[in-house]
Design a protein with these regions (language model features):
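Membrane-interface loop-to-helix entry segments
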Residues: 136-150
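N-terminal TM1-TM2 helical hairpin plus the immediately adjacent luminal interfacial "cap"
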Residues: 14-140
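A short linear-motif detector with a strong N-terminal bias
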Residues: 1-2, 7-9, 47-52, 85, ...
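Conserved small/polar residues in nucleotide/adenosyl-binding loops
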Residues: 151-158
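C-terminal transmembrane module of polytopic alpha-helical membrane proteins
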Residues: 1-17, 24-26, 161
């Protein structure tokens, strides 16, 4: 068991930035899943526990938890959600690094997540269709962060040609 943990630590240290982001996302997913299991085993309600890490659509709730603009992009709703986000990050992260640096990928990942989160909040607070759902809507997952790396890559290819 100790060698597995040592190997994981070493892979994290030596891995590319996209591997490190995948490790962080998977670690958060495992921790939240284990927390959910523990709550269920002890017949405790999980309602509201992770809302403090998910991005609320409500501006008033966001003011009370501004850190959620960063934490939401590391939370995932289920196995398939994290699987496809991490596959997307793995494939396009490697491709991204063939044109840009690790620092660029980290920045694009974080800024893409922040911009995606702000766009989500703006949409829920501007468009009348979403207004009735604003108070109980939350965003989670790397779905805003990961595709930005691909679109940034496509923009670079377009300018290069």
């Amino acid at each position: 068991m100790a060698t597995i943990i040592t190997d994981l630590k070493e892979t994290f240290r030596r891995g590319n930035i996209y591997i490190q982001l995948i490790y962080i996302n998977v670690a958060v997913f495992i921790l939240t899943t284990l927390t959910e299991v523990m709550f269920q085993l002890f017949n405790r309600s999980i309602a509201g526990v992770f809302e403090w890490l998910e991005l609320p659509a409500s501006v008033i709730r966001f003011i009370l938890q501004p850190w959620s603009l960063l934490t939401y992009m590391f939370m995932h709703a289920g196995f398939m959600h994290i699987l496809f986000n991490m596959l997307w990050l793995y494939w396009f992260g490697a491709l991204f690094l063939s044109f840009f640096s690790a620092k660029h990928l980290r920045g694009v990942y974080i800024l893409g997540g922040i911009c995606g989160g702000l766009l989500y909040m703006a949409a829920y607070n501007i468009f009348p269709y979403f207004r009735p759902m604003t108070d109980y809507s939350f965003m989670l997952g790397a779905s805003a962060s990961v595709p930005v790396s691909y679109t940034h890559l496509r923009a670079h290819e377009t300018r290069s040609n």
